């Protein structure tokens, strides 16, 4: 009798995706982050669901309801901090996952890559809206500053911003709709992740060499299930260390002050995972220019397949491109640091140089490095 997991309509899908899936024999720990992102998403949905049971999306009670969750709800504090720090872990995994894709040329799977970019945008939107919900000072002013950027769009900008706000400023209507969107978006992300996986399984996984691995496949279970479990244990360990020892390490102290439209905090800045984009936004003195640079800093990922000039897929055997990649990583870390600094000398010029470098490395230096490597190998 044939195994039920191979015949049952539902179990067959799970089997083909997680059990009998043919996987390359040589994929490294950089391939763990896909499953870790899945774990992060499930964790965020579950903790978020329990938070939503006690949260009130109203300007007068939102801040108090979060305090109530932390003080009065059984284990509310751990749920709240797992959700807040879970977002940080989510973005760490996201950046690693995207970085892996760039390094090993995974962007040549066009559909998978493009859905991945959409997933990145959706996750960033969700995190932004979630940051507004506690209705602290940084929640309110972050929402005001970021939504206001849309007013830079010619002709329709002002109307668009007021439409999003549901009034003439960030107020009750804004908070309510942000809560509604923040609740629904993770489920949209989950659906998109399924499509992401569907397209990936059409081609099979890439591997560190970038060479087709059809001749050497192994079953996903037990080899990569056990490897993913190790990654998951490490993820949860780091998350719980954050939650239980330094829950506010990555947060902003200003968000423990209730939102006050009459008092602007001295330094308005987003959560750490948006600082690189925020630095790029601030480095351009023009409002529309800044917004365009902000969007393009992420949207540039879409054109990565067009910028691939190398005859090899992966960077594994391309030392010049490897140098470019790690300079890009250093540049992103510099931008992240600058995004959290006040707008004054020398931070302004460092931010502008780092922003120019970011686009220069991706659009010019990496493609040129690839051409040089092709010529060195006489290809």
Swiss-Prot record:
Source organism, top-level taxon: Eukaryota
Transmembrane annotation, as ranges: 33-53, 77-98, 113-133, 178-198, 226-246, 288-308, 320-340, 347-367
Gene Ontology molecular function: metal ion binding; ubiquinol-cytochrome-c reductase activity
Binding site for a ubiquinone: 201
Positions bound to heme b b562: 83, 182
Pfam families assigned: Cytochrom_B_C, Cytochrome_B
Membrane topology: Multi-pass membrane protein
Keyword presence, rRNA-binding: no
Note on cofactor: Binds 2 heme b groups non-covalently.
UniProt KW keywords: Electron transport, Heme, Iron, Membrane, Metal-binding, Mitochondrion, Mitochondrion inner membrane, Respiratory chain, Transmembrane, Transmembrane helix, Transport, Ubiquinone
Signal peptide positions on this chain: none
Family indicated by similarity: Belongs to the cytochrome b family.
Note: Heme 1 (or BL or b562) is low-potential and absorbs at about 562 nm, and heme 2 (or BH or b566) is high-potential and absorbs at about 566 nm.
Assembly information from the UniProt record: The cytochrome bc1 complex contains 11 subunits: 3 respiratory subunits (MT-CYB, CYC1 and UQCRFS1), 2 core proteins (UQCRC1 and UQCRC2) and 6 low-molecular weight proteins (UQCRH/QCR6, UQCRB/QCR7, UQCRQ/QCR8, UQCR10/QCR9, UQCR11/QCR10 and a cleavage product of UQCRFS1). This cytochrome bc1 complex then forms a dimer.
Protein name in UniProt: Cytochrome b
Native source species: Ovis aries (Sheep)
Lineage, top ranks: Eukaryota, Metazoa, Chordata, Craniata, Vertebrata
Gene expressing this chain: MT-CYB
